[in-house]
Amino acid sequence: MIIVIIMPKNENNPNIKNNNHQSPKKRIALTAGTFDLLHPGHFNTLNFAKKHADELVVVLARDETVKRIKGRRPVIPEEQRKIMIETLKPVDKAILGSLTDKLEPILSVKPDIIVLGPDQTTYQLEELKNQLLERGFKTEIVKVEEYVKCPFHSSYDILKEIIRRWCNKEIELK
């Protein structure tokens, strides 16, 4: 036997969900980078950003953009980097950057805070703030000041170590 109780909508009844009541707006943080060969500095920036928001969106530099800026493509293709970043604990969403307008992902996400890594060169804090204001968007922008110093604190250092260990040596596959 099934008993169905139909209750009239009652604003004063705490057992009835009020669909008109909006939950508080989630604070969104955005950070951006290549995130090619992951290292402790990446995790430091991601954790810092997540501490400042409820949701963290990461914008990944496109392969073509990295080639244009750094003169080389990333080791790991953009779609694979996106998958890797999406699986990291502090990250709620990863998106690929724009090929033509570096501000487009920011204007699309509309973050409450933008977190720049300590070695961020694509975005300079004041320049970014001014460019966003010119487009009618105001947000908080902070730069991670603490730089994680360890043997492999950059993708470049990881690549140098791989070359040092493996260059001119026959690689044994087991």
Curated annotation (Swiss-Prot):
What Pfam families is this protein classified in?
Answer: CTP_transf_like
Q: Which GO terms describe its molecular function?
A: ATP binding; FMN adenylyltransferase activity
- Pathway given in the UniProt record: Cofactor biosynthesis; FAD biosynthesis; FAD from FMN: step 1/1
The text of the family note is: Belongs to the archaeal FAD synthase family.
Protein task: Catalyzes the transfer of the AMP portion of ATP to flavin mononucleotide (FMN) to produce flavin adenine dinucleotide (FAD) coenzyme.
Q: Which PANTHER family match?
A: FAD SYNTHASE
Instruction: Tell me what this protein is called.
Output: FAD synthase
Encoded by which gene?
Answer: ribL
